[in-house]
Amino acid sequence: RVALHPADNKNLNREFPGDKNGTPTEQLAEFFTREFISKMDFLIDMHSGSWNQQLLPHVYSPFVDSEELDELTFEFAKATGMQHIVMYGERPRDPANSISYPNTAMTHGKPGLTTEIGHLGQSDEAFVEATLELSRNALYFLDMLPGEPTPHPAPVIYDKLKSVVSPVDGLFTPRVEIGSVVEKGTIVGEVRDYFGNVVTELTSPINGTVMMINETPPVKAGESPMTIGIEQEV
């Protein structure tokens, strides 16, 4: 619920392009679309893991089946200097039916990235510096500051993210860490009942890298406490 507006219980990043006559969240999305996206050339939507999530720093490089735009967006993503780049093509192509802030930018022909740095509501020096570094690189790429961007020398590209889903209610405990490389079938966590008894073990549905872990123990059946990234085949 950390991402929901208290007035209408909606997530801003799921209400684009918005509605000026809608709920408070829908009105805010419409304002961003009208006043920012219509006037910008590039967008970076900066996220973190908030208070409940641990994550491997990464950047989403969306694509909308427009060769020129998709290529420019990917070049922008690499220029940030972030090592882990997730290719993301599961958002709408129609600007009238977009979903998120970056998706709305993309449907208007403008590169829109999402970065994920930091976790558990912390603002320690390493996370702050990483965010400043990607910001400087982006400004170099856009010729808004003198200098050249420094792409990561060994970028890791992911084709898809896959959720690990709990079949039961309970308390989740991970058995792997962020950045762990796992094989399909590896036990990545367990769900216990309120008396501490193991109800089920959760396994990875794929070979991949652990990208996100929810650190708050309660989990409901059908929810995902962990996300695995599938690396692009070279």
Where are each of the predicted segments found?
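Structured catalytic-domain cores with a bias toward divalent-metal coordination
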Residues: 1-234
